[in-house]
């Protein structure tokens, strides 16, 4: 899919069902998210509304169909860190490695820069040995986008009767 066919726009609460459909397989079949329970449609609508009050919540469309989304939120809940944001991104599983994630992050970084954000962080589930629940593709994506490893939390996630590490990746914009 050529990247020029991808349209980026702000998410609305009307997008919640589609975004939830993208997110659900990540909850059910991967350790990419530590959510164990799929949020309700109303919870997802509320998330879009709450995030959008202070940060961008973006969707990527191709021919009117949403293929992925990303949003930013406060990284540390202290005033001295208000120039920092944490990133989250989810792309429809069949549309990974198509440019959707790159376009979402490029637009997000541009908007956050204009908003006065200076530091971006991504907390990514990590495994020393890839398995059916987790590869390190998210880490590789972030590194391609210019993020560098800034921290490592050991065995901080439990899902599918296993423990997973989380690494913190950072990018100064």
At which residue positions do the language-model features occur?
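Conserved catalytic-core motifs of GNAT/GCN5-like acyltransferases
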Residues: 123-125, 139, 143-162
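Conserved acetyl-CoA-binding loop-helix of GNAT-fold acetyltransferases
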Residues: 97-113, 136-140
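A short beta-loop-alpha structural element at the N-terminal edge
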Residues: 7-19
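C-terminal "cap" of GNAT-fold acetyltransferases
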Residues: 135, 155-173
């Amino acid at each position: 899919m050529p990247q020029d066919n991808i349209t980026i726009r702000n998410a609305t609460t009307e997008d919640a069902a589609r975004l939830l459909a993208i997110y659900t397989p990540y909850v059910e079949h991967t350790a990419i998210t530590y959510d164990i329970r799929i949020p309700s449609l109303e919870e997802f609508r509320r998330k879009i509304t709450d995030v959008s009050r202070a940060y961008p919540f973006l969707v990527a469309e191709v021919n009117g169909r949403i293929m992925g989304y990303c949003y930013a939120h406060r990284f540390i809940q202290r005033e001295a860190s208000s120039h920092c944001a944490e990133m989250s991104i989810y792309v429809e599983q069949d549309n990974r490695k198509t440019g959707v994630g790159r376009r979402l992050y490029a637009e997000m970084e541009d908007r956050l820069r204009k908003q006065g954000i200076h530091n971006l962080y991504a907390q990514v589930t990590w495994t020393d040995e890839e398995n059916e629940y987790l590869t390190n593709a998210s880490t590789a994506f972030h590194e391609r986008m210019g993020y560098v490893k800034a921290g490592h939390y050991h065995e901080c996630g439990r899902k599918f009767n296993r423990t997973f590490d989380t690494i913190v990746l950072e990018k100064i914009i």
